[in-house]
């Protein structure tokens, strides 16, 4: 709420040196009404990252607390109409619940075909000290029960992706 309120009341005269704003969002609240409430920053918002972490409704609603896949898809359609956006990154935190959906997630780029540059990025799940079941979820770790399957899926996935628009932080892991 703080950042939303900040953007809704943003006064360019107070921040004359800001030439661009990058937003990181899950896009569940990114409706036309919400975007219009921030009209004073439209020309500054050139880049956004949208955390999705799934390729299907079922998984999204499992890994995203209070996730609404249908609302997300509707909001992605709206985001695709925003003329000032130059860069959109869709992000996916790899975990035991979603690693089989990477290819489906990759296809979400096509929903943003009006944006000049759309990328996907795959992050390995990290332990920030608050997740009780980290070891159970961290499928990218070599001691995970599903690591061999994940590694095989990842190796096949790497063969079909465009490395100019798809990046990851799994270097040194596989």
Spans of features found by a protein language model:
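Radical SAM enzyme [4Fe-4S]-AdoMet core and its adjacent flexible, acidic
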Residues: 4-8, 13, 17-18, 36-174
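Short beta-strand->alpha-helix junction loop in the catalytic core
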Residues: 26-29
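Structural motif corresponding to alpha-helix initiation and N-cap regions
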Residues: 31-35
């Amino acid at each position: 709420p703080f950042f939303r309120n900040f953007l809704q009341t943003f006064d360019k005269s107070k921040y004359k040196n800001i030439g661009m704003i990058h937003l990181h969002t899950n896009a569940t609240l990114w409706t036309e009404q919400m975007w219009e409430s921030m009209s004073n920053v439209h020309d500054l918002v050139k880049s956004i990252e949208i955390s999705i972490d799934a390729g299907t409704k079922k998984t999204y609603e499992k890994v995203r607390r209070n996730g609404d896949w249908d609302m997300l898809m509707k909001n992605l359609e709206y985001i695709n109409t925003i003329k000032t956006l130059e860069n959109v990154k869709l992000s996916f935190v790899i975990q035991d619940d979603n690693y089989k959906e990477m290819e489906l997630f990759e296809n979400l780029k096509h929903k943003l075909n009006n944006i000049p540059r759309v990328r996907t990025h795959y992050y390995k799940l990290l332990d920030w000290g608050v997740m009780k079941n980290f070891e159970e979820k961290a499928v990218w770790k070599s001691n995970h029960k599903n690591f061999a399957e994940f590694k095989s899926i990842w190796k096949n996935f790497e063969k079909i992706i465009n490395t100019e628009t798809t990046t990851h932080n799994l270097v040194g892991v596989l």
